[in-house]
A protein has these predicted regions:
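N-terminal capping segments
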Residues: 2-135, 175-177, 188-193, 226
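Short, basic/aromatic beta-hairpin or loop at an interaction surface
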Residues: 132-153
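Short alpha-helix capping/helix-loop boundary micro-motifs
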Residues: 155-163
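Loop/turn positions that initiate beta-strands
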Residues: 167-170
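A conserved glycine-rich beta-strand in the N-terminal activation segment of trypsin-fold
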Residues: 178-182
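Active-site or metal-binding loop neighborhoods of secreted/extracellular toxin and effector enzymes
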Residues: 187-227
């Protein structure tokens, strides 16, 4: 069909839009198309690479973080992976006016209809996510509503960055902030309102310590070979 012929392998949005406009005489704007597709991609949570949907574990936490990064999740203080609606944003503005108010225009322009999280919300959202229903259910699966510093304080296995083990799914911490180590020297973190969920080199950031998330199981990668 004409529509199918517009698609090509590893095709950029601008080329696809140009092909569709040429085939159908439309006048689709590339940025409008990109924004729509971003919202579609952001809403989907990819669990296809999870090793065990029945437990909350470090390897699936990594996959959760990678999915959030690939989907370009945004950042809104006090959120934990929900799709940002007008009602949710207004509720958060009332709850955290000083933290969110200065960024309200930016958030409305960039994140409505997109999944968002703050730094610790990215971690809590994984534990609260129900893989059967696709819902994020607050306070479930033994994960309390803690802050970044509380998470680090409550961890029983932790240390300075010089002692950090090579374990995907451990957490990296600095006062007031936390991220997810994904391996090979990189972490994924909800960095801030203007940045969203990003992938960063651990050595390039000012992390002060690491810890194991005390509310999930830790699986050695060798234990899941063949799954």
């Amino acid at each position: 069909s004409r529509l199918v012929s517009c698609f090509g392998a590893e095709q950029a949005d601008d080329q696809l839009v140009a092909n569709v406009n040429a085939a159908f005489g439309t006048d689709i704007v590339v940025q409008d198309f990109t924004n729509v597709m971003r919202n579609v991609r952001s809403r989907r949570i990819d669990t296809t690479k999870y090793v065990d949907c029945g437990t909350k574990n470090n390897l699936d936490l990594v996959q959760w973080a990678v999915s959030a990064y690939n989907a370009k999740w945004g950042y809104v203080m006090g959120t934990f992976g929900q799709v940002l609606t007008v009602d949710l944003l207004e509720a958060k503005l009332q709850q955290l006016p000083d933290a969110i108010g200065p960024y309200e225009d930016f958030i409305r322009a960039n994140y409505l209809g997109v999944r968002t999280a703050d730094c610790i919300g990215l971690i809590k959202g994984y534990s609260w996510y129900d893989t059967d229903t696709g819902e994020i259910r607050y306070g479930t699966n033994g994960m309390p509503d803690v802050g970044a510093d509380q998470m680090y304080a409550q961890a029983t296995e932790k240390g300075s960055m010089s002692t950090m083990p090579e374990i995907p799914g451990i957490l990296v911490h600095a006062p007031g902030h936390i991220g997810i180590y994904i391996g090979n020297g990189y972490a994924i973190e909800a960095m801030g309102t203007k940045y969203g969920v990003v992938k960063t080199a651990v050595a390039s950031r000012n992390w002060t310590g690491w810890c194991k998330n005390p509310y999930i199981n830790y699986i050695e990668e060798t234990e899941v070979e063949g799954i």
